[in-house]
UniProtKB/Swiss-Prot annotation:
Organism: Streptomyces coelicolor (strain ATCC BAA-471 / A3(2) / M145)
Annotated EC: 2.7.11.1
Limits of the Protein kinase domain: 9-270
Protein name per its UniProtKB record: Serine/threonine-protein kinase PkaB
This protein's UniProt keywords: ATP-binding, Kinase, Nucleotide-binding, Phosphoprotein, Serine/threonine-protein kinase, Transferase
Top EC group: transferase
Domain of life: Bacteria
Alphabetized InterPro entries for the sequence: Kinase-like_dom_sf, Prot_kinase_dom, Ser/Thr_kinase_AS
Amino acid sequence: MARKIGSRYTAHQILGRGSAGTVWLGEGPDGPVAIKLLREDLASDQELVSRFVQERTALLGLDHPHVVSVRDLVVDGNDLALVMDLVRGTDLRTRLDRERRLAPEAAVAVVADVADGLAAAHAAGVVHRDVKPENVLLDMQGPLGPGGSHPALLTDFGVAKLIDTPRRTRATKIIGTPDYLAPEIVEGLPPRAAVDIYALATVLYELLAGFTPFGGGHPGAVLRRHVTETVVPLPGIPDELWQLLVQCLAKAPASRLRASELSARLRELLPMLAGMAPLDVDEPDAEQPEDAPDASAASPAAPVSTAEPVRRRGAVPLVPGAKPADSNRDTHTSMRVPAPDELAGGARGTARAPRASGAPRPGSARNRAATRRRRIAVGAGAVALVAAIGVGTWLATGGDEDGGGPQDTRNSAPAAP
């Protein structure tokens, strides 16, 4: 059912739902548009509405080929909406869900486009604060780039900042998506342009590997890894690309490249990446407690199916019940800033090291079962050896038919007087 948005726009059909609201296919005076209608609880917040109006000039002035332009901001009764250019295509999360990972050339081309858009935004004083695959749109009607990549555009500018008002989120709250949060955000520092670079480098890692460098498991563990762990190398990519990733994933914001520098460096690497196949690495599973039940031990006779599709994980949702395969899931929300002792890494650390395809993961059910079998085999061998020694000793000392009395040892009882 169509609904009016202000006096100039009509929303016809829902395109998707996100954490801050619903995106509609709409119509305006100049043709089709995308209309992001914010949630009712946000629209009823007068402080947010005031901030919404204040951001109007900055958002409307952000015009770049790799940014989804905001055409208008509408405040009408209970409606609070951003009217944006309509991009005919899909988002990067949908492509990742379909392909799992991209060839390095295509991945770098997509991220270089997004870095170009971020450079324009940062020059205008706008920090995105929620860079992730869900917020990168691929224009299927645009010309193909390196590696067959479609032009990439960054969307949802201003939404994170609008939600993060002083009244709605105190200084003890984190706003964002756990897998892509820069360490300084986890530690409660104000977001600067460098947080977007860290998030974009995380996206690049995910495009190459099929998983994020610090994701997996409980959101609290994810946040701790961002602060305490170093990124583990990805096998199979050129050292120049890896060093670029490491620099942009640096814990210190000042050590990261600026968006314009990142874009230029990535485009310089494109020729050496031409023709490279997607990486062949397995996703490390989330950590399991050592006393966790072992599925293989619980039902040793159960048949193992090899036809079941591999489960893939995208961003870790903070909202209970969100389905990993749902690209519209609510991942952009708030969470308490962890205390310093909660951010301290354990003795073993929590980083998830990529493995070569088919290699067993230490701590996995399969690896634990193999370890258990080796221990049983070693134990059985030890028992057999002890038994053999015992039999040999008996034959040597007490195996004759008229053998004498038992020999006195330290552990035998003294003879009665």
